[in-house]
From Swiss-Prot:
It catalyses: uridine(32) in tRNA = pseudouridine(32) in tRNA; uridine(746) in 23S rRNA = pseudouridine(746) in 23S rRNA. This is Dual-specificity RNA pseudouridine synthase RluA. The active site is at D64. GO terms for molecular function: 23S rRNA pseudouridine(746) synthase activity; RNA binding; tRNA pseudouridine(32) synthase activity. Keywords: Isomerase, rRNA processing, tRNA processing. It comes from Vibrio vulnificus (strain CMCP6). Disulfide bonds: none annotated. It comes from the Bacteria. Dual specificity enzyme that catalyzes the synthesis of pseudouridine from uracil-746 in 23S ribosomal RNA and from uracil-32 in the anticodon stem and loop of transfer RNAs.
């Protein structure tokens, strides 16, 4: 399923929310690729924009083009290796917000559905109990909404345990409440409700690659301004980077 037209937002060109000698964090807008695509017309990306000012900048994780929010980059190879290892061992934690179609009945829960690439329709993913990779997403209802036109939506706080491609989007669809504006997994009114995918990476916790102390970063959510810095209310990681020899490899 090819991208029909790529018109990424340009104002602001970059929005840096934190920077030191080792890491740089930005608020990536919806509609901008995390890294360049294969075609020349898809070169514009969060990474390529940062590289104009930071030639040594390194990618350590990605967000879907349509997802907005927090991305952390490494400013040198040593920081890149340290951060990538944390993602590999699932030492990072993330909090997302999503507006989904309809009112979700349960106040909280865990979605445990294995995912696999829907190869004929790639990059779409699908639930596959036989061949899919284990995928878990905890969720909490933040707010149930009724709009002026009668439409019902729910603001969801999503806490991914695993990090599969399109995981949050497919899990919400499987729950019966697709994320509004989702060009792959929402249909009809759920798709047309919003001009963008209303999925935002708000918080990330990790261990600083130099000091090895736990820290977190937060980016406010445009479509849910009540989002607050609360990641350590949901996760309780060690305050200092653990010994990798004591950890199971993801």
């Amino acid at each position: 399923m090819a991208m029909l037209e790529y018109l990424p937002p340009t104002d602001p060109w970059t929005e840096i929310i934190f920077e030191d000698d080792h890491i740089l964090a930005v608020n990536k807008p919806s509609g901008l690729l995390s890294v360049p695509g294969r075609l020349p017309e898809h070169h514009d990306s969060m990474w390529s924009r940062l590289q104009e000012q930071y030639p040594e900048i390194q990618v350590v994780h990605r967000l879907d083009m349509s997802t907005s929010g927090l991305m952390v980059f490494a400013k040198n190879k040593r920081a890149e290796a340290a951060l990538k290892k944390q993602f590999q061992y699932r030492l990072t934690h993330k909090v997302y917000y999503a507006r989904v179609w309809g009112h979700v009945e349960a106040d909280s829960g865990m979605i445990d559905l294995p995912l696999i690439c829907d190869w004929p329709n790639r990059p779409m993913q699908k639930v596959c109990h036989e061949h899919g990779k284990p995928s878990q997403t905890a969720f909490q209802v933040a707010k149930r909404e009724v709009h002026a036109n009668g439409a019902q939506t729910t603001i969801m706080r999503l806490l991914p345990v695993t990090g599969r491609s399109h995981q949050l989007r497919v899990h919400m669809q499987a729950l019966g409440h697709p994320i509004v504006g989702d060009e792959f997994y929402a249909q009809g009114d759920a798709f047309t409700f919003s001009e963008r995918l209303e999925l935002h990476a708000a918080e990330l916790s990790f261990y600083h690659p130099k000091s090895h102390w736990l820290r977190s970063l937060f980016v406010p959510c445009d479509f849910y301004p009540d989002a607050e810095e609360m990641i350590f209310s949901y996760f309780d990681p060690a305050r200092k980077l653990p010994d990798y020899k004591s950890l199971p490899k993801s």
